[in-house]
C-alpha cells in the first residue's frame, strides 16, 4: 500500500481519537498498527505528524496493543526507530516522544517485568541516557532527552516502587554532579527512589541493622521484585511505617536530606512541592530524624505567594503538627490564610482554595478527628470581620464566605455574633431583592443556596426565620416558575433539619397562598407550578389537605380545563390527588376528592387522564385508607420479573407517564453481524434478558442511499438462535456509506429502552453485482456484449467515461487466485491468462476490467461510465492485491 502523506495521517489520527472502537471496526488492529509503525520510519512523513501518530500509542495503547506479543513487537519497533535516529536538535522532540511511547505501552499493557526483554532493554537505555551528566558526551542538544529519560525513570519508580532502589549510589552521584537545568529532574528522581527505598525497609519494622546504609550505597541491577506489598503513606495516617536507623545511618540520611533541601530553591514551585512531600514522608518514617530539619525552609515558605509552596506548609503541618509548628506559627498561618482569601491580586479559584484551607486547617491539637469542615480554634470573630460577602463578589466566593462566617458566628457568642448573624441575613435579603427583580438563573440559584446555608446554621433565630418565610412567600407569588427551587429547598432542609418545623411551616404557608388564589387567567397560567407545590405539600401528613381538595375542585369546575384536555395538566392534577389519597386524614376530604375524581373521569377530554382518574376513584371508594396508602406506595419485590402492577404504575417514581417514556439503555445488548453474503443479523449478548417488540432503525449519514425502513422483530431470547433480518439497500450513488443504527425494545418488566448499535458500514465491494443478463445467455453473447460496452465506454470530452490502468507485481498464479476469489461471479471470459470482468453498480453504472499478466506484473485495464468510481476501485484493488 502506498504510504500516506502527512495530511492523510492528520485526518486518520483525528478520526481515531474521536471514535477508537468505531475506527477499528472498519480496519483490523494489526493492519492499522503495522501501517502506523511502518510510516513512523518513513522520511516522507513530517516530524510533527509523527508526534501526532505516536499520541495514539500514548492515549490508546490498550486498543492498539491487545496482547503481549503485540506489545513486544511495538516496543521493539519503536526502540529500533529511536536507535536509528540521529542525535540532532531537529529530531529531539520526536526522540523524546518515542521514549514516552515505549514506556506507556510497556506499563499500560502490563508488560514491564523481568520476563520481558524489551522492558530490560528499555530500562538499561534510560539509565544510559541519564548517565551523560552535564552534557559531556552528547552536548547541550541532547539535554531534553536526558530530562525526558529522568521523568520516564521517575514514572517507572512511581508505578513499581523500589525498582531503582539498588541503583541509589549512582543516582545520588549523578544528582550531585548535575549542574545544568536538568538538575531538577535528577533531584526529583533521586528523591522518589529514596522515599520508596526507605518505605520498603520500613515494612520490615524494627532497627534497620545496616540495611539503610547498604541501600544508600547500593549500585546493582534493577530490583524487579520490589513491586509487591507496598502501601501508600497518608498525610495524617495513624498507621505509618516506621524505620529505626542506627546513629551512623541517621547521620548519613540526614546529610542527604539536608543537601536536597538546600537545592530546593533551585526548583520550580511545583517541583519544590513534590520534593518537600517526598522528604516529609521520609522523615515521617525515619523516626530518628527530627522534623526540625525543615525549619530553615519554613522561614522562606511562610512568606511565599506561590500556591504550591504554601500547600507544602500545610502538608508538613498535617504530618508533624506541634513537633514542627509552634502555637505562634499556627496563629500566623491562620492570619495568612484569612489575608490571602481576599488578596486583590489573586484569582478567584486561588482565593477559594485558601478559604477551603481554613475549613480543613490541620491544627496542632484538633478538637475533633473527623475530616469534615471545621474551623480552627484560633480563628476568631475579629479575624474574619473582613470576610463578609457582598453582591459584588462572584457567586462561589459569596457562598464560601457565608459558610465560613456562619460557622464562626455559630461557635461564638456575644454581641459580635448577633450583629454578624444580622449582617448575614441582610446579605441574603440583598440577594432576594435581585431575584425579586427578575434576576438571572445564576443569581436565583445562589439565592436559594444562601437561604439553605442560613437555615442550616441559624434555624433557631425565630425572628429571622419568620422574615425569611414571608420573603419567600412573596417571591413565589411574584414568580411561580421558581416552584422547583422551592420544592428542592423544602426537601433539602427537611433532610438537614429532620426534627425542625420550618420546612413544614414553609410548605403550609405556600399551600395557604395558593388555595386562596382566584381562578382567573393569571392563576390558570401558573397552574402547573402551583400543582407541583401542592403535590409536595400533600406529602406532609401534618398538613390538612381539605383546602387543597377544595381548590382543585374549584379549578376544575369553574374553568375550561377539562374541555381543553391537556394531558400534562391532567396528570399534574392527578399527581396531587395521588398524594392526597395517601394522607392519614383522608376521611375529612373524602366527598370532595370523590367528586373531583368522578368529574375528571367523565369530563376530561383525554383518555389517559380519564383512566387514571377512574382507577383512583375505584381505589378511593372500595379500599380502606390503610390499604390505600400501602397500595399506592408499593414497589415491586427485588428480583421480581413481572413488576408492572397497577399500584406500581401509579407511584411517584413510576407513574403512568413513565410507561410512555423511552429510556436510554445503560449498555448495548444488540449488535448487527453479517451471517451470509449480503445478509445481516443481530445477536444478543449471553447474559442479557429476553427482549420484545424490537424495532431496528436506520439513519442515513449522507444522501447516497434511499432511506431504510424500520425492521420489526417480535422477540429475542438468549437460549434461541438469533433471527436473521434482511436489509434492502437502494443506492442513489454507488459509493461507500455508513448507516447509524439504533434499536428500540421492551424488557420483561415492561420498560422500553433505546440503544445505539454499531454503525452499519456499506463498502464499495458490497455494491458489486453481475450484469443483469438472462441466465440462459451463451458465453459468446456475453463476450460480444463486453466488447461493445468496452468500445462504448471510450472516454472523450462529451461524456463522463474514463479509463485507467492499475499495475501490481505478482505471478500468474497469484493473479489467477485473486480473480477467482474476488471476481469469479463477474468474469465474462478467462482465456490464456487474460480475464474480462464486467461489474454492474446500481443504480446505473458499470466497471469493465481487462486483466492480463506480463513479466510477472498484473495489469488491470479499467473503463467505466462514471469517473468518480475510480478512486474507490483503486483502493479496492490495493486491498485485494496486498492480501
From Swiss-Prot:
Listed GO CC annotations: AP-type membrane coat adaptor complex
One record GO biological process: protein transport
Protein's UniProt keywords contain Transport: yes
Protein name: AP-5 complex subunit beta-1
InterPro entries: AP5B1, AP5B1_barrel, AP5B1_C, AP5B1_middle, AP5B1_N, ARM-like
Gene symbol of the encoding locus: ap5b1
Position of the signal peptide: none
Key words of the record: Protein transport, Transport
Keyword Transferase: no
Functional note: As part of AP-5, a probable fifth adaptor protein complex, it may be involved in endosomal transport.
Subunit structure: Probably part of the adaptor protein complex 5 (AP-5).
Amino acid at each position: 500500500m502506498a504510504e500516506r502523506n502527512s495530511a492523510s495521517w492528520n485526518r486518520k489520527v483525528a478520526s481515531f481519537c474521536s471514535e477508537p472502537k468505531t475506527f477499528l471496526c472498519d480496519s483490523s488492529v494489526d493492519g492499522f498498527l503495522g501501517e502506523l509503525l511502518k510510516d513512523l520510519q518513513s522520511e516522507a512523513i513530517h516530524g510533527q505528524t509523527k508526534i501526532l501518530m505516536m499520541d495514539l500509542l500514548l492515549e490508546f495503547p490498550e486498543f492498539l496493543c491487545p496482547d503481549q506479543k503485540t506489545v513486544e513487537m511495538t516496543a521493539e519497533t519503536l526502540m529500533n526507530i529511536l536507535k536509528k535516529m540521529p542525535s540532532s536538535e531537529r529530531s529531539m522532540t520526536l526522540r523524546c516522544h518515542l521514549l514516552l511511547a515505549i514506556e506507556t505501552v510497556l506499563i499500560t499493557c502490563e508488560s514491564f517485568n523481568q520476563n520481558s526483554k524489551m522492558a530490560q532493554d528499555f530500562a538499561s537505555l534510560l539509565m544510559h541516557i541519564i548517565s551523560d551528566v552535564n552534557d559531556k558526551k552528547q552536548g547541550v542538544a541532547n539535554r531534553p532527552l536526558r530530562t525526558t529519560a529522568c521523568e520516564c525513570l521517575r514514572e517507572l519508580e512511581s508505578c513499581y516502587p523500589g525498582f531503582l532502589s539498588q541503583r541509589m549510589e549512582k543516582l545520588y552521584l549523578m544528582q550531585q554532579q548535575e549542574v545544568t537545568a536538568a538538575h531538577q529532574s535528577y533531584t526529583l528522581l533521586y528523591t522518589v527512589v529514596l522515599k520508596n527505598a526507605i518505605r520498603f525497609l520500613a515494612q520490615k519494622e524494627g532497627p534497620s541493622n545496616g540495611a539503610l546504609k547498604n541501600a544508600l550505597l547500593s549500585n546493582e541491577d534493577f530490583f524487579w521484585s520490589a513491586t509487591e506489598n507496598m502501601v501508600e503513606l497518608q498525610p495524617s495516617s495513624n498507621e505509618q511505617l516506621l524505620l529505626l536507623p542506627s546513629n551512623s545511618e541517621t547521620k548519613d540520611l540526614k546529610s542527604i536530606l539536608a543537601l536536597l533541601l538546600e537545592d530546593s530553591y533551585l526548583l520550580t514551585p511545583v517541583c519544590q512541592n513534590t520534593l518537600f512531600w517526598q522528604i516529609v514522608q521520609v522523615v515521617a518514617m525515619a523516626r530518628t530524624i527530627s522534623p526540625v530539619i525543615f525549619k530553615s525552609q519554613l522561614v522562606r515558605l511562610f512568606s511565599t505567594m506561590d500556591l504550591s509552596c504554601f500547600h507544602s506548609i500545610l502538608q508538613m503541618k498535617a504530618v508533624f503538627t506541634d513537633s514542627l509548628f509552634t502555637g505562634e506559627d499556627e496563629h500566623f498561618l491562620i492570619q495568612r490564610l484569612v489575608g490571602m482569601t481576599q488578596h486583590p491580586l489573586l484569582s478567584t479559584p486561588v482565593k477559594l482554595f485558601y478559604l477551603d484551607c481554613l475549613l480543613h486547617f490541620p491544627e496542632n491539637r484538633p478538637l475533633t478527628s473527623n475530616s469534615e469542615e471545621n474551623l480552627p480554634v484560633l480563628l476568631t470573630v475579629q479575624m474574619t470581620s473582613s470576610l463578609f460577602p457582598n453582591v459584588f463578589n462572584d457567586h462561589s466566593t459569596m457562598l464560601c464566605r457565608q459558610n465560613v462566617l456562619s460557622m464562626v458566628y455559630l461557635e461564638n457568642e456575644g454581641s459580635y455574633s448577633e450583629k454578624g448573624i444580622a449582617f448575614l441575613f441582610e446579605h441574603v435579603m440583598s440577594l432576594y431583592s435581585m431575584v425579586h427583580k427578575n434576576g438571572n438563573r445564576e443569581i436565583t440559584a445562589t439565592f436559594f443556596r444562601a437561604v439553605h446555608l442560613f437555615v442550616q446554621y441559624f434555624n433557631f433565630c425565630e425572628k429571622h426565620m419568620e422574615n425569611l418565610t414571608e420573603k419567600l412567600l412573596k417571591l413565589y407569588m411574584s414568580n411561580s416558575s421558581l416552584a422547583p427551587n422551592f420544592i428542592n429547598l423544602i426537601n433539602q432542609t427537611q433532610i438537614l433539619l429532620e426534627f425542625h418545623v420550618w420546612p413544614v411551616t414553609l410548605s403550609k404557608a405556600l399551600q395557604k397562598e395558593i388555595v386562596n388564589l382566584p381562578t382567573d387567567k393569571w392563576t390558570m397560567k401558573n397552574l402547573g407550578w402551583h400543582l407541583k407545590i401542592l403535590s409536595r405539600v400533600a406529602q406532609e401528613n401534618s398538613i390538612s389537605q381539605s383546602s387543597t381538595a377544595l381548590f382543585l375542585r374549584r379549578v376544575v369546575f369553574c374553568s375550561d380545563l377539562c374541555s381543553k384536555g391537556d394531558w400534562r395538566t391532567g396528570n399534574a392534577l392527578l399527581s396531587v390527588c395521588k398524594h392526597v389519597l395517601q394522607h392519614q386524614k383522608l376521611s375529612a376530604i373524602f366527598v370532595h376528592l370523590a367528586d373531583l375524581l368522578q368529574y375528571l373521569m367523565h369530563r376530561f377530554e383525554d383518555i389517559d387522564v380519564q383512566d387514571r382518574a377512574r382507577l383512583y376513584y375505584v381505589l378511593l371508594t372500595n379500599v380502606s385508607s390503610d390499604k390505600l396508602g400501602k397500595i399506592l406506595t408499593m414497589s415491586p419485590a427485588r428480583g421480581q420479573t413481572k413488576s408492572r402492577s397497577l399500584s406500581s404504575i401509579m407511584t411517584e417514581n413510576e407513574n403512568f407517564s413513565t410507561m410512555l417514556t423511552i429510556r436510554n439503555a445503560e449498555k448495548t445488548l444488540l449488535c448487527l453481524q453479517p451471517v451470509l453474503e449480503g445478509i445481516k443479523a443481530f445477536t444478543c449478548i449471553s447474559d442479557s434478558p429476553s427482549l420484545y417488540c424490537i424495532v431496528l432503525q436506520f439513519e442515513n449519514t449522507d444522501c447516497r442511499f434511499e432511506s431504510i425502513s424500520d425492521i420489526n422483530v417480535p422477540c429475542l431470547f438468549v437460549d434461541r438462535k438469533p433471527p436473521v433480518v434482511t436489509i434492502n439497500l437502494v443506492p442513489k450513488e454507488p459509493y461507500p456509506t455508513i448507516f447509524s443504527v439504533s434499536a428500540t425494545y421492551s424488557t420483561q418488566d415492561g420498560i422500553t429502552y433505546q440503544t445505539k448499535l454499531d454503525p452499519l458500514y456499506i463498502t464499495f465491494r458490497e455494491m458489486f453485482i453481475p450484469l443483469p443478463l438472462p441466465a440462459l445467455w451463451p458465453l459468446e453473447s456475453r463476450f460480444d456484449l463486453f466488447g461493445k460496452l468496452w468500445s462504448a465506454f471510450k472516454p472523450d470530452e462529451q461524456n463522463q467515461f474514463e479509463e485507467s490502468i492499475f499495475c501490481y507485481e505478482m505471478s500468474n498464479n497469484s493473479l489467477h487466485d485473486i480473480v477467482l476469489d474476488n471476481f469469479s461471479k463477474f468474469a465474462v471470459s478467462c482465456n490464456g491468462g487474460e480475464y474480462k470482468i464486467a461489474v454492474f453498480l446500481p443504480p446505473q453504472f458499470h466497471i469493465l476490467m481487462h486483466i492480463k499478466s506480463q513479466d510477472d506484473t498484473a495489469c488491470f485495464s479499467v473503463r467505466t461510465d462514471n469517473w468518480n468510481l475510480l478512486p474507490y476501485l483503486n483502493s479496492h484493488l490495493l486491498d485485494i492485491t496486498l492480501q
